């Protein structure tokens, strides 16, 4: 699996240390093991997880601005855990409402010795944001409109929303409230992945 990951990273132009690669593989192995009992993901093959979960998450890392992020609706830690491994200087709050997912995240935190994550069980609407976050990240969480509505209290004045999407979400962008603007849309290149991937970066308009 290490060889496959190394080839995928090379194709993506991403350079990681051996320690980071081993952490990513350990996370995939844990996800595969726990998935049998906890049903954390529909992806069953660890090699497929490398593409659809690991690479699909970490290609976002160069576009994140700031040091303090929250991954809302993180599920089994996607994209938050892979991002925390490749961005060890940043801190990631991993938010999910289901206890079994948060238990898995805490076990990952313990086994991989990840000091820059904080798994939290909470609904996003009820989670306090003190201090506010530099970035609110979501992957397969909600429409853009729902994301900014439910998470409006989380980013700071200069904070951004980072929404990981499949195809270009033109309809969702058109429905964004006028107090928000799309700062950029990045077409992501994920090696060995069928289908499109886009990152939509949103900021609140200054009043």
From Swiss-Prot:
Domain of life: Bacteria
Changes seen on gene knockout: Low-level streptomycin resistance.
Compartments where located: Cytoplasm
Misc. remarks from the entry: Mechanisms acting on transcription regulation, translation or protein stability could be responsible for adjusting RsmG expression to rRNA synthesis.
Classification lineage: Bacteria, Pseudomonadati, Pseudomonadota, Gammaproteobacteria, Enterobacterales
Entry keyword annotation includes Methyltransferase: yes
Effect ascribed to mutating residue 79 to A: Lack of activity. Low-level streptomycin resistance. 11-fold decrease in AdoMet affinity
Record note on what altering residue 39 to A does: Lack of activity. Low-level streptomycin resistance. Slight decrease in AdoMet affinity
Family named by the database record: Belongs to the methyltransferase superfamily. RNA methyltransferase RsmG family.
Gene name as annotated: rsmG
EC code: 2.1.1.170
Consequence of substituting residue 165 to A: Slight decrease in activity. Streptomycin-sensitive
Record's protein name: Ribosomal RNA small subunit methyltransferase G
InterPro entries, A to Z: rRNA_ssu_MeTfrase_G (IPR003682), SAM-dependent_MTases_sf (IPR029063)
GO cellular component: cytosol
Functional note: Specifically methylates the N7 position of guanine in position 527 of 16S rRNA. Requires the intact 30S subunit for methylation.
Binding site for S-adenosyl-L-methionine: 73, 78, 124-125, 139
Outcome of mutating residue 123 to A: Slight decrease in activity. Streptomycin-sensitive
Family annotation (Pfam families): GidB
Result, substituting residue 53 to A: Decrease in activity. Very low-level streptomycin resistance. Slight decrease in AdoMet affinity
Keywords: Cytoplasm, Methyltransferase, rRNA processing, S-adenosyl-L-methionine, Transferase
Swiss-Prot/TrEMBL induction comment: Induced under stress conditions known to stimulate ppGpp accumulation and down-regulate rRNA synthesis.
Gene3D superfamilies: Vaccinia Virus protein VP39
Gene Ontology molecular function: rRNA (guanine-N7-)-methyltransferase activity
Biological processes, Gene Ontology terms: rRNA base methylation
HAMAP family: 16SrRNA_methyltr_G
């Amino acid at each position: 699996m290490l060889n496959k990951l190394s080839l995928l990273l090379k194709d993506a132009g991403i350079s990681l240390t051996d320690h980071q690669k081993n952490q990513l593989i350990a996370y995939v192995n844990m996800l595969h093991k726990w998935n049998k009992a906890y049903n954390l993901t529909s992806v069953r093959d660890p090699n497929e997880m490398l593409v659809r979960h690991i690479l699909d998450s970490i290609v976002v890392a160069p576009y994140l601005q700031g040091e303090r992020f929250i991954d809302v609706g993180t599920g089994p830690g996607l994209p938050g855990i892979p991002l925390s491994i490749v961005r060890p200087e940043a801190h990631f709050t991993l938010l999910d409402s289901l206890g079994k997912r948060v238990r898995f995240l805490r076990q990952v935190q313990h086994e991989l010795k990840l000091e820059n994550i904080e798994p939290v069980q909470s609904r996003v609407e009820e989670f306090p944001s003190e201090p506010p976050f530099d970035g609110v990240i979501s992957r397969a969480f909600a429409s853009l409109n729902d994301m900014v509505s439910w998470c409006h209290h989380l980013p700071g004045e200069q904070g951004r929303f980072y929404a990981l999407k499949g195809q270009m979400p033109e309809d969702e962008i058109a429905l964004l409230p006028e107090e928000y603007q799309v700062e950029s849309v990045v077409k992501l290149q994920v090696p060995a992945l069928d289908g499109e991937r886009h990152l939509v970066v949103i900021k609140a308009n200054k009043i």
